[in-house]
Amino acid sequence: MKKLILVASALGTALAMGTMGSALAQKSAADGIAEYRAMLADGNPAELYEAKGEDLWKKKRGPKNASLEQCDLGQGPGVVKGAFVTLPRYFADTKRVQDLESRLVTCMETLQGLNAADIAKTRFGQGEMANVTALATWVASESRGLKFNLSQAHAEEQVMYEVGKRLFFMRGGSHDFSCASCHGEDGKRIRLQDLPNLTKNPGDGIGFAAWPAYRVSNGQMWSMQLRLNDCYRQQRFPYPLFGSDATIALGSYMGVNAKGAENIAPAIKR
């Protein structure tokens, strides 16, 4: 009997130690990634894109030889600070809900005379599309530290949220994935990477509150639309068109859910 008690006690201790070890391993992995990102953020290359974006905002360009300083991002012509954390939102002049990137292209067309359709067809990282990413990076940086608070006052904003929600949970592609497959509940991860639950506020600087971001793995600046396109690629879906209602609706869904989260964009990612 005494031997049985000793064996049971030893097994209990081993199980407890195993559970503690697993918890410590998970915690240390998450902490290690956080420390890695903190070190990388000291001298984030995104600062170069911020500088380029600010210069593009103030520089006279295009057939109309005009700057973007009168661009209305939702807070009034020329007002940049605070705009990013309210987008996507409805704009009366275009009669549609727009995210930051599609709104910037609207301003580039109306104020500078550039061709919006041509920009939309340009590959990410090239030509005027690279300029859109730089502009978005700078605009996002001007709202760093502010809390997300997307409007749902207009009927079109409400529609886009609901469309985004449906798209988020829609399964498809050869792998039968949805956005929710990775980001629909707490506690999911890929390898050492924790996956945020984007059906609610995932926390300051997480998910929607971190993009645009500099990707260390490929040395590129990624906008939110490019990030969503990459998600579609992983789902084995065709890429959405730039400024499509699909990506803007998903942005609306995640942005509204992120209400109260602090913006840290432009962030730095693996």
Predicted features along the sequence, with ranges:
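Bacterial N-terminal signal peptides that target proteins for export
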Residues: 1-9
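Bacterial N-terminal signal peptides
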Residues: 8-18
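Sec/Tat signal peptide C-region and signal peptidase I cleavage site
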Residues: 19-25
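Electron-transfer interface patches adjacent to heme c in soluble/periplasmic c-type cytochromes
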Residues: 25-48, 58-134, 144-145, 170-270
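Short, charged low-complexity linear segments at domain edges
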Residues: 38-54, 145-165
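Hydrophobic, well-structured mid-protein blocks that either form specific transmembrane helices
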Residues: 135-142, 151-152
